[in-house]
Amino acid sequence: MRITMIGAGYVGLVSGACFADFGHQVCCVDRDAEKLAMLKLGKIPIYEPGLDDLVTTNTLQGRLRFDDNLADAVSQSDVVFIAVGTPSRRGDGHADLSFVYDAAAEVGRSLKGFTVVVTKSTVPVGTGDEVERIIREQNPDADFAVVSNPEFLREGSAIEDFKRPDRIIVGTDAERAKAVMGEIYRPLSLNVAPIFHTSRRTAELTKYAGNAFLAMKITFINEIADLCERLGADVQDVARGIGMDNRIGAKFLHAGPGYGGSCFPKDTLALVKTAQDAASPVRLIEATVSINDQRKRAMARKVVEACDGSVRGKTIGILGLTFKPNTDDMRDAPSLAIIQALKDAGASIKAYDPVGMEQARKMIEGIAFVESAYAVAEGSHAIVIVTEWNAFRSLDLKRLRALMATPVMVDLRNVYRGEDVVKEGIAYSSVGRERHPVL
């Protein structure tokens, strides 16, 4: 089938490349001339394992192309996906839908023949209704259907998530649209990936509810971690113990510095605002947002505590800047608030990330970016593991100890066992577990 993907960002590029790999003809449309130039040269503007090869292969085989001419692409398409950004609106926290509505208006002016218009972007309930109204206003005689098909891609494993999904949610009551969506996802249905049909509004809310639940689960285990520190329990064992219950499950029960990234912070806030507007507040999610916002500065206080109550005049080394491993995404990364809080407390900061340095330099000022974990350790009064990159899981602890001004490790991801670190002469603090002073 012929597919137009409006937006060549994270969701649009991954989805477009995967659809092309299924054999569809895909055109990714974007307004960013610099990004399009890079993509046409085979340069991928985001870091996602496997995406470079997928884009290159399908571009060379003629199934994937990039363009800025939305009207031309839409007029030739069977399916048009809207995969543009929906950031939090400044001032009130609602999702900013201006890019979605602008795209809908352009689509409306360009439709020819029956076309399925799909909102792939994460949007509040009722957005599909407005997209339909806008298209109809622009083109009263257009033959089209608007579908909600939310994405469930995790950065760092997005291709695997797209090709082997837990489920595919299709929100529409239009039978012709259901048939078209079934056809474009047919390769996945052969792998027994269930297509779940529901109403458009239900599909829109399902995406927000899913992300909010996962954010709440992360926040829950972080609260339990704080309690573990007070009571002398081990949060990792607590998480394992409750995760063995198949009603709960082990995923998203890893205590740490709080959630970040492009989805959870934005989507939980948007759900809170949507619920407030509907006079049906979601108090659990309101609490989740508040607790997570406070979490990052609480982690900075943990670092200060590990440094004998003050970091003024001290150098703190940060290992990991991105919000999670296997991505270069710095959006709402815990490192941003932690670094700022430590700077406010008088610390000098050195930092390293295996992939995220370029993006971090755009967002963080007044710190030293260095080229390895050991360069971070050199002269530091403490090192702080903020992101659990595999490269940080097997550091030479003896070498770290020799390089540091004072031997202190604050492990915000519980990567190490305290006894292993202390054995090498490094004081060790973690999250929700016993603190280990130097022997």
Which residue stretches match the model-derived regions?
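Structural/interface elements that position substrates and couple domains in central-metabolism enzymes
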Residues: 1-439
